[in-house]
Amino acid sequence: MQQVYVYDAVRTPFAKLGGGLAKVRPDDLAANVIQAMVERYPNLDQSKIDEVVFGNANGAGEENRNVARMASLLAGLPTSVPGLTVNRLCASSLDAAIHASYSIGSGDNNLVLTGGTESMSRAPYVVPKPERAYPAGSSQMVSTTLGWRLINPKMPEEWTVSLGEATEQLVDKYQVSRERQDEYAVLSHQRAHAAWEAGHFDNLVVPVGDAKRDETIRPESTVETLSNLRTVFRKENGTVTAGNASPMNDGAAAVLLGSEQASQTLGADPLVRIASRGVAANEPQYFGEAPVPAANLALERAGITWDQVGAIELNEAFAAQVLVNLDSWGIELNDERVNAWGGAIALGHPLGASGSRVLGTLARRLKAENRRWGVAALCVGVGQGVAMVVENEDATE
């Protein structure tokens, strides 16, 4: 197997539900980041891009089933460049990078443009077809924005609870306090705001129309203000609120992967090397636990320990999930290695794009902070976790 590298990363701003990107189709969001990426390499023969692999969690509407191919064509790439869409819900675009890394590692491909896209604002309603023609009754219309839809009745009820209720069950299991959740959420907003002010996103985020900045960062948040918010999923003894959970968003992100030889194709040096990957699963209702075994597996495969990791990008679906993960790894809530530029609670979580956002940010952070080892990890609805370990080979730490 040959080595695989991350060469570059871009993303759109992440807009709030019904916000600045609500009128932009998900295939156009993806086309925007594809165009932005290839424009950085004006001398690149675009036919040398072996494949476009994108993640998407919905796929029920304007994604038109295979959004990677649609976006590739919309972006003006040669028709000879294939497109593949993968779906592992929230980790879809990290899985896109994993798929691409295997194809490059095997020698089948040299340069693959990966990414993810999601428009939660434009997710359609679906109506199941009747079992017989001309029914007299009514059909149920189901939103595809988030969570379960058209559940198979053979599924055990405890597996099919909402993501929020599942998180409350995680809180019960691990006794995560509301105060700790709110404290972590405030930290996410503060770090995201500071990262924007410091210019960390200047070379990472590309505008789409009038949308130029992430829309859900609230640096004025405090533990006191968050403590006044109502719980969403349990009226009594609940802890999960709109303040300590990720919002619903629209956005897209892209990560360019290649072999060592791709450096000559691009005329650029890589950011980081992909060292290992890990995927794990557990009981569906405890989806928030799954990044723990996934990341542990990736670390084992890379031959390193948590003490050697200098940067961690852990997707913040819920503050409670983050705290359960960090506690399991023996990492403090305010550890500077974790989501130093903010996380999904502040930046946003456009499902299929978040894996690329996490990986791209991790690669940039390792370079900016002169750290060698980094871990990217995401939880996935229905009890899965995905992780990747990368190495900044130029680090002097």
Predicted regions span which residues?
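Conserved catalytic cysteine-centered active-site region
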Residues: 24, 56-112, 144-145, 158-162, ...
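Flexible glycine-/small-residue-enriched beta->alpha junction loops
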Residues: 111-169
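Active-site pocket-lining segment
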Residues: 165-168, 201-204, 211, 275-346
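Active-site-proximal alpha-helical scaffold in enzymes
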Residues: 88-118, 171-200, 254-261, 327, ...
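Conserved beta-ketoacyl condensing-enzyme motif
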Residues: 22-112, 117-135, 205-214, 285, ...
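Short, well-ordered amphipathic alpha-helical segments that serve as non-catalytic structural scaffolds
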Residues: 27-41, 67-71, 96, 163-170, ...
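Condensing-enzyme catalytic core mediating Claisen C-C bond formation in acyl metabolism
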Residues: 1-24, 146, 224-289, 293, ...
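N-terminal extracellular/periplasmic Venus flytrap/periplasmic-binding protein-like
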Residues: 11-12, 23-32, 43, 180-265, ...
